[in-house]
């Protein structure tokens, strides 16, 4: 696997409005540059997090920084540092981890998960969380892929892990043993963790193909936190963030630790429940909440649920995975690339904001490979210190009955090279453009583009039109094979309750608003749009529905 690309951002002059450099044909961040520690300095993410925490909690280190909304358990800034050190010491003494070992984590959200993450980071152990709702076969495949030496689970998820195949077995996070580990004081020799060392293996969503294992280094995540710290704004009281997004997902993984490092409070929910969320917002005076798009849709469609709760503390609602874009990022970029800041940027509908600090980008023509100026659509390429270290292979090693002597994760250099070139540019696979003010617009996934008689049709554009129809609750558009056109746009539509809107009416509605080649040619009515745990539409499942024969061409 290639070494991390710690290239210096170009100093060529660029337009101060758009960030576009006519000489290099690249876009530069218009945000203040975020200071980073020297790349060669050994520094685990844990120590960087606590260095920020010391700056942001000097006035009151006894206040809570982690709260479990389910159990009401609270952890203060002082306790977080103490618990992290104690747990790291206990784990070192009991298991004698080697730097580069991988820990598999299968748990719902709780206040102890960030403690576990930080402890493992300090030991140089690679954190690899997974979705607790995955099936037993899926868990087995992920363990074969990631090659952990230990698993951390709960009494509710332990049955999914074959712990006898792991070198150090399994630790239950809701057991007296774990509680003893975080409370028992101890010391351990400091592990020299390089910033270029892997910190985490996360899985991208896999909405268009097989789930991909993404390796993020300590440097990648440090740069993401540094960018957020540079953009922070002074507050009279700490921000209180309710994280309903799973901690195994990139957003939740980064958010659960970053918010604390920036001086905030993170309130976690072990399982999502709309009324429990409302109570938590009211009880803990939540200011920021991260929600999957379907949750927001549910709140809007069932506004009565919110009655009787004081939600006046809310300042920001964040969402990702589908429309409601206020920011843009990938697992491969440690979470962030661009975001909207301030009321003026937020007024520009459809924009995902300006590039984050220490980020540069270019928009590349799909046919010629030439970098394009503002207002031209092409594939977005990004570069910066937050770009992943690489990908991992999907060998299942079916003939191996044990992982006791297996190495850590296996690099997939070929897959990495197809995503990140020799100059450090990550190909996002997203069709995008910048406007003359340096605001990024994400049009669609390139894999999802429909090729109709040589024209490229973006499903997201048609989905926006469909969802503006008063009788449509949700809609998604996929390509459907056609002998004459190659592919035609097909819509899968969920009617609103009580609606009997007809296919012909929907086709006419769309046809009046788009070019002829973009018209919906085929429609199927379904009960729900398939989505993954983080709210992203599962395109593969949609295509299966489209090809199942339930649709009729009119």
Predicted regions and their residues:
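Conserved ATP-dependent adenylate/AMP-binding module captured primarily in the ANL superfamily
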Residues: 132-162, 183-184, 224-242, 273-287
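AMP-binding/adenylate-forming catalytic core of the ANL superfamily
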Residues: 134, 151, 289, 384, ...
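Conserved AMP-binding/adenylate-forming
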Residues: 69-73, 90-134, 243, 456
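Conserved AMP-binding/adenylation subdomain of ANL enzymes
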Residues: 222-240, 248-288, 298, 302-303, ...
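Conserved AMP-binding A3 loop
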Residues: 74-79, 192, 199-226
């Amino acid at each position: 696997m290639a070494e991390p690309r710690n290239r210096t951002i170009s100093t060529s002059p660029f337009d101060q409005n758009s960030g576009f450099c006519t000489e290099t044909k690249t876009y530069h961040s218009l945000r203040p540059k975020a200071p980073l520690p020297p790349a060669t300095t050994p520094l685990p993410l844990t120590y960087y997090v606590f260095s920020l925490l010391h700056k942001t909690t000097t006035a009151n280190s006894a206040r809570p920084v982690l709260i479990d909304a389910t159990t009401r358990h609270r952890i203060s800034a002082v306790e977080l540092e103490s618990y992290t050190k104690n747990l790291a010491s206990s784990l070192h003494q009991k298991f004698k981890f080697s730097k580069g070992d991988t820990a598999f984590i299968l748990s719902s959200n709780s206040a102890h998960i960030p403690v576990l993450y930080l402890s493992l980071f300090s030991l140089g152990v690679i954190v690899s969380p997974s979705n607790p709702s995955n099936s037993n076969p899926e868990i087995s495949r992920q363990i074969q892929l990631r090659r952990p030496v230990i698993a951390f689970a709960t009494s509710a998820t332990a049955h999914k892990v074959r712990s006898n195949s792991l070198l150090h077995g399994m630790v239950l996070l809701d057991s007296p043993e774990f509680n003893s580990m975080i409370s028992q004081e101890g010391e351990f020799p400091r592990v020299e963790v390089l910033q270029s060392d892997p910190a985490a293996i996360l899985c991208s969503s896999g909405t268009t193909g097989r789930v991909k294992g993404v390796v993020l280094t300590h440097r990648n995540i440090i740069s993401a936190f540094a960018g957020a710290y540079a953009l922070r704004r002074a507050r009279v009281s700490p921000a209180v963030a309710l994280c309903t997004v799973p901690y195994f997902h990139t957003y939740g993984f980064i958010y659960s630790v970053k918010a604390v490092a920036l001086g905030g409070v993170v309130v976690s929910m072990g399982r999502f429940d709309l009324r429990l969320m409302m109570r938590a917002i009211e009880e803990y005076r939540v200011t920021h909440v991260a929600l999957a798009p379907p949750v927001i849709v549910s709140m809007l469609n069932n506004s009565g649920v919110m009655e009787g709760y004081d939600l006046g503390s809310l300042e920001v609602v964040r969402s990702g995975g589908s429309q409601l874009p206020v920011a843009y990022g990938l697992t491969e970029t440690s979470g962030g690339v661009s975001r909207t800041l301030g009321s003026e940027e937020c007024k520009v509908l459809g924009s995902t904001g300006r590039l984050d600090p220490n980020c540069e980008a270019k928009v590349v023509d799909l046919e010629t490979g030439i970098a394009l100026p503002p207002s031209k659509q092409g594939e977005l390429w990004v570069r910066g210190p937050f770009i992943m270290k690489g990908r991992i292979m999907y060998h299942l090693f079916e003939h191996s009955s044990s992982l006791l002597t297996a190495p850590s994760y296996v690099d997939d250099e070929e897959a990495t090279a197809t995503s990140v070139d020799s100059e450090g540019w990550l190909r996002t696979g997203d069709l995008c453009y910048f406007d003359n003010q340096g605001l990024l617009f994400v049009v669609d996934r390139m894999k999802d583009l429909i090729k109709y008689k040589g024209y490229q049709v973006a499903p997201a554009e048609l989905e926006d039109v469909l969802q503006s129809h008063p009788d449509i609750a949700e809609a998604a558009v996929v390509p459907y094979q056609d002998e004459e056109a190659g592919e035609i746009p097909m819509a899968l539509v969920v009617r609103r309750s009580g609606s009997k809107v007809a296919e012909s009416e929907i086709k006419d509605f769309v046809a009046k608003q788009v070019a002829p080649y973009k018209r919906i040619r085929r429609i199927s009515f379904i009960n729900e749009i398939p989505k993954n745990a983080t709210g992203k539409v599962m395109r593969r499942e949609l295509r299966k529905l489209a090809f199942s024969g339930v649709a009729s061409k009119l």
